[in-house]
């Protein structure tokens, strides 16, 4: 069972959660979009899509850490520069092997539960994420993976996938490298 308590301290909200699982959101971000290159750094109301998503994800009561995962390509240096300037955690890995990038980022952060989201979803509702995490942790069925993308019931841009590290590791070990 998970118990949550929100405390206000000097105008800031401190979230306290009783859970023995390290929960890490990994945000997939790249500049080389085919339809709208550089869209994750496009600004809406003075903030980039990545910044809006970061703010939204920080409102989650369940997430311990948020990582922006981008490629090692030079074109993605702009994402790195923004994240560094804003103090966001960033991981750089393979551009083509996204599964490898996620696995390495999750491993580096000792993640036990991973939330996969895309940086071009700035309006993602953190309560949806918290609800999905809660199901994964507390449901009597022993889930390894949850998604709200397989049977699209939420509006586009509210998509998330949540998995255990064991499920990610298994996918990483058994995926075809073709």
Model feature map: region roles:
Residues 20-70:
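N-terminal glycine-rich phosphate-binding loop and ensuing alpha1 helix
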Residues 117-119:
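Active-site acidic Asp-centered loop
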Residues 111, 160-170:
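Conserved nucleotide-sugar donor-binding
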Residues 146-160:
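Short beta-strand-to-loop element that shapes/binds the nucleotide-sugar donor at the catalytic cleft/hinge
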Residues 127-149:
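Conserved donor-nucleotide/metal-binding helix-loop-beta segment in metal-dependent transferases, i.e.
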Residues 75-82:
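Acidic helix N-cap motif at the loop->helix transition within catalytic regions
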Residues 114:
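Short aromatic/hydrophobic "clamp" motif used to bind/position activated sugar donors
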Residues 84-96, 107:
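Conserved donor nucleotide-binding strand/loop of the catalytic core
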């Amino acid at each position: 069972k998970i118990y949550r308590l929100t405390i206000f301290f000097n105008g800031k909200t401190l979230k306290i959660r009783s859970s023995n699982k390290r929960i890490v959101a990994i945000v997939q971000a790249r500049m080389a979009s085919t339809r709208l290159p550089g869209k994750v750094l496009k600004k809406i109301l003075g903030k980039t899509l990545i910044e809006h998503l970061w703010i939204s994800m920080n409102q989650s009561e369940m997430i311990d850490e948020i990582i922006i995962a981008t490629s090692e390509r030079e074109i993605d240096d702009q994402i790195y520069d923004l994240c560094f300037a804003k103090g966001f955690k960033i991981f750089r890995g393979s551009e083509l092997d996204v599964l490898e990038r996620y696995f390495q980022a999750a491993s580096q952060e000792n993640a036990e539960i991973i939330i996969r989201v895309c940086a071009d979803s700035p309006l993602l509702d953190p309560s949806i994420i918290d609800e999905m995490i809660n199901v994964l942790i507390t449901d009597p069925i022993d889930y390894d993976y949850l998604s709200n993308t397989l049977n699209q019931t939420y509006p586009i841009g509210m998509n998330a996938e949540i998995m255990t590290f064991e499920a990610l590791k298994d996918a990483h070990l058994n995926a075809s490298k073709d």
